[in-house]
Amino acid sequence: MSINEEDYLQLEKEIKLDDIDFSDLEEKYEVNIGLDNYIIVDGAPIAPEAKVPVLIKVLRKLFSQVGEIVEGDEGIYMPLENGKSKGYLFIQFKSTESADLAIKKLHGKKLDQNHRLLVNKLSDMEKYGVDGAVNEEFIEPEIEPFQSHGYLKSWLQDEQGRDQMVLHFSETVGVYWNKKSADPEPVIEPRKGFTSKYAKFSPKGTYLFSIHPQGIQSWGGANFNSIKRFFHQQVRLVDFSPNEKFMVTLSPIPISLPDSTVDRAQFPFGPESEGHKLVIWNMITGEPVRTFALPPHLEGQKEMPWPLVKWSYDDKYCARQGPDALAIYETESNFQLLDKKLVKVDGIQDFEWAPAGVKLHNSKAVDGKHVLSYWTPESTNQTARVALMQIPSREILRTVNLFQVSDCKMHWQSNGKLLCVKVDRHTKSGKTIFSNLEFFKTNERDIPVEKLELKDVVVNFAWEPNTERFITISRLDDGNPNPAIPKNTISFYAPEVTKGGVNHNSKKKGGAAIAAAVAAAAINNQSSTKYKAYTKIENKHSNTIFWSPKGRYVVVATISRTSGELEFFDVSFDDETNKKSLPANVKLLKTDKFSGMTNISWDPSGRFVAAWSTSWLHAIENGYRLYEFTGNLLRDDSIDQFKDFVWRPRPPSLLTNSDKKKVRSNLREYSAQFEEADAMEADAAVKEIILARRKALEEWRKYRAKHISKQGNSKNEVQAEIIEEIKEEIIEEKEEIVE
């Protein structure tokens, strides 16, 4: 039956299409017009039409690594113009996820030396490429107002010259003033949840850092206000450059770029950092300046050697050790490799920068040269070697060949004049270990090396700051490792100069004269210097050495799970009964037992020593003790769940040598002032008496000045003034009981 047009139109009017459900058909025949699985790649090479198929093949192989590309010409389209490609192309992936991954992984990828690929979604190009989508009128960016954090070195202005310390107990962290035997005075209110792991000061004490799952937070100023945030998820280890310009962080979790474009814009890392775990930060801007992947041999290690990045004394260079090579970077050239290549050192085991500029013989450099030391083990056709290298020239200044070497440890003296290499050697049978000490004298011609051969194994070595004296702890390798038997020997070494150095028959006595003689020997660069153990203490459990930062005083301690002991020594003791003047005159000042002790630290002034037991290792006598440099116990504070004690470092003194000389000449006057201040702080009654006397004296001076001005300048009167000063001193006190 046929229907004419008129009837069809009438029927169409009668049928209500809105009542019919077409959803199944719409879903079945839906046309996908979305562009989310398309990307546009810019920065590709401009190639002749004949070479375009080869270029497409290369790019297809590259982008297929992140996802499946549609086959044929629909998968990759590269426009041509005048017989050449136009430098960009379109790629269609089979899924949106593959397109997102391509942008995340390959944006910024260097195809070769001259071409870097820029990858974006086609939908973004369409979004921003349409006329009017982007405002062409320049809008001045809003600059955030400067936010002052106060004076970052405000603690140095303390009138009493006190040092600050961090006490970490339970979940609370507090910063306190050291008040000797009295309760520490809080600088700010202690904060609960201040850090999720530990708190740490920068090397000069300017910043305090807290560790969090999201990264690191820096604090500073008088009230420890928030300064910068450094985003690095699950960071574990932190280190700093000596001058506080840079910070290094390490996380076990590799860096992963966010999927969201908005989040990626706020993310501090770019595609080149994908998968990296080690980050160097600029501490001023808070931005990452370089990231690194961990070397393959360190991946999966439970105990990570730290630091992985080591710095020159002035922050100008930093270096990383890799397999058979050193990577040295110039911080002033955006952390580019020195000369754009690695320093090849086959088998390198360890390296250390000189902690100060090395003034090489006949060098006119005021600040000294950058020098690092490294060692390599024995191989089939080569001996073990220790070498000194100058940077940036890479010149090898000195090399020493060593035989039958088990291990080496390099110890630079604080001013860079000496390097001691502790060489653990084995006998031909390999059953016995003993140590040699190799001393490199960097200031002398050709850098001579003095050798000190020992029969014992040196388990610890430490230089006295700024001198040639040092201490070793050693033991005889007799095959009996029983820790209950005290077998360690503490040896105090000093230079024995045989020609024009230390004068052993000097008429000047005392520690000051001895220290001056030792310093003179170092300055005179006597190549005939030998090192002699002036004092040995045998049969000890001692295993650690802690020199005062000012020298002369040292704590030799036993730190173990079962026992703890501190021994305080003066290595320049003024002994008037001893007529001999020696480079080292050692006196045991005090001994104290501290079971459960885990750590020891000197304050920056060298006046106080803190020892503590941390709950991070065990629950035995958690808390801390505070000692004077002579070993007198000032404070014993047991604190449940005590975790850490951190002194706040101080920057180097700004005083010139003439200023320091002036202070030393007026030391008695300053000592009297300090003793008065100590007496006031220790006893409230004494404080009231002293303040009352000061007030009375000030009133008398005002009264006297007032009446002298009234008398005028009379020539006929003889103006005489008698001032009586009475000093009371208690010589001796005795208490007698009268029955």
Curated annotation (Swiss-Prot):
WD repeat boundaries on the chain: 190-229, 231-293, 301-339, 343-385, 453-502, 537-579, 592-630
Record region (Sufficient for interaction with HCR1 and TIF32): 1-98
Main location: cytoplasm
An example Gene Ontology biological process: translational initiation
The keyword Chaperone belongs to this UniProt entry's keyword annotation: no
SMART domains: RRM
One example GO MF annotation: translation initiation factor activity
Xref: CDD domains: RRM_eIF3B (cd12278)
Pfam hit, one: eIF2A
Alphabetically ordered keywords of this record: Cytoplasm, Initiation factor, Protein biosynthesis, Repeat, RNA-binding, WD repeat
UniProt xrefs under SUPFAM superfamilies: DPP6 N-terminal domain-like (SSF82171), RNA-binding domain, RBD (SSF54928)
Entry's family note: Belongs to the eIF-3 subunit B family.
Assembly notes: Component of the eukaryotic translation initiation factor 3 (eIF-3) complex.
Protein name (Swiss-Prot/TrEMBL): Eukaryotic translation initiation factor 3 subunit B
Organism name: Candida albicans (strain SC5314 / ATCC MYA-2876) (Yeast)
